[in-house]
Amino acid sequence: MKLEGRNLTFQYDKGDRRILNHMHITLESGERVGMAAPSGFGKTTCCKILAGYEQPDEGEVLLDGKPLSSYRGYCPVQMIWQHPEQAVNPKKRMKDVLKEGDKVETRIIRELGIEEGWMMRFPGELSGGELQRFCIARALGEDKAAAGG
């Protein structure tokens, strides 16, 4: 998969400074990219635009050359939130949390080092790192690209 942000421009309120100013970014399957900037400089906004949660004021997001906006009801780009405890229902066991997304392949669960015993636990019974693995597995599901937030 190839995810592209072309000429992305975004500002929250007209008259405010632009959070993104004609930004270009290309991500290929398997690539890991980090963004470093002070708070308020658009890292999360960029990820939200790349995942389709926000629309840019200018520019476009393409997945394998096809506009991301053309995916109706199914978006192959998913967010992996920075604070995993806020991304899951605390009253559901982890096996049920994984069912909320698309089917998660057993291979992904193994590759992320998720232990079988963790499946019956509630989110509050897992460490932050263990919980993050579940969020990654759920975001990846089948045939997904992931953006961090």
Language-model-derived ranges and their functions:
Residues 83, 90-104:
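Q-loop/switch helix immediately C-terminal to the Walker
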Residues 103-117:
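Conserved ABC ATPase "signature" region
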Residues 36-38:
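The feature captures the beta-strand-to-loop junction immediately N-terminal to the Walker
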